[in-house]
Amino acid sequence: LAGPAAPPAPGFTGSPGVPRDTTTGHVPLPPGGPVTMPPPATGAPDVTSTTLAVLLIGPAGAGKTSVAKYWADHRRVPTAHISLDDVREWVRSGFADPQSGWNDNSEAQYRLARRTCGFSARNFLANGISCILDDAVFPDRPVVGLGGWKRHVGPGLLPVVLLPGLEIVLERNAERSGNRRLTDEEVARIHGRMAGWYGSGLPIIDNSQLDVPATARVLDEVLARSIASPPKW
């Protein structure tokens, strides 16, 4: 016999449940509304079992996708990982590769991918599944800035910046292949612009000397502080 249902995880609670349609066996899912901040914890928040929406920001080679995957894999509550680069590459024929130049077409596909990520994140959260997204969000370009993420996911999105040293991102970029590998000059340019996050009020993790598991642990610590005192952005 099945035991009693487990209590829901703390954090974002999503939409009220939708009654089951007993005539067809179809299982309706709650609609995904804007993600709000988790309610204040009575004590120290247990980030590993709290339903959250996280945005991991960083330059190419920062390790954000690897960290996001590891973090999602090792949580105590259901957690999804969405990489904007992966979603953008869903477009096969007609893919506007930003490496070929940033133009109206590549910007439109970026915006579409971001909106798709936001829609997915809201639906995951509405159904009790945490979500961590990763994207190279620039502090000095509103088009690819935080405003769009906040608009598409909701005010409860928790942004965190991964920013290792330049030599680290150059080494990691050299290990890449295909259209994910950039020139050293482009990597250095992106890394320099990402330094603009210093002084922004967002939490920043320098993972130059940290492996992926250690970075994920620091991410948990940063998120606990963000829940207790949300960053202004």
Enumerate the language-model features and the residues they cover.
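Long, basic/Gly/Ser/Thr-rich N-terminal segments
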Residues: 1-42
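Hydrophobic anchor at the beta1->P-loop junction of P-loop NTPases
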Residues: 56
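P-loop (Walker A) phosphate-binding loop of NTP-binding proteins
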Residues: 59
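Conserved lysine of the Walker
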Residues: 64
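Conserved substrate/cofactor phosphate-moiety recognition/catalytic segment
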Residues: 69-112
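Glycine-rich phosphate-binding loop used to anchor ATP phosphates in small-molecule kinases
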Residues: 108-154
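Conserved phosphate-donor/acceptor-positioning beta-strand/loop module used by diverse small-molecule
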Residues: 153-173, 205
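Small-molecule kinase domains that catalyze NTP-dependent phosphoryl transfer to phosphate-bearing small molecules
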Residues: 178-218, 230-233
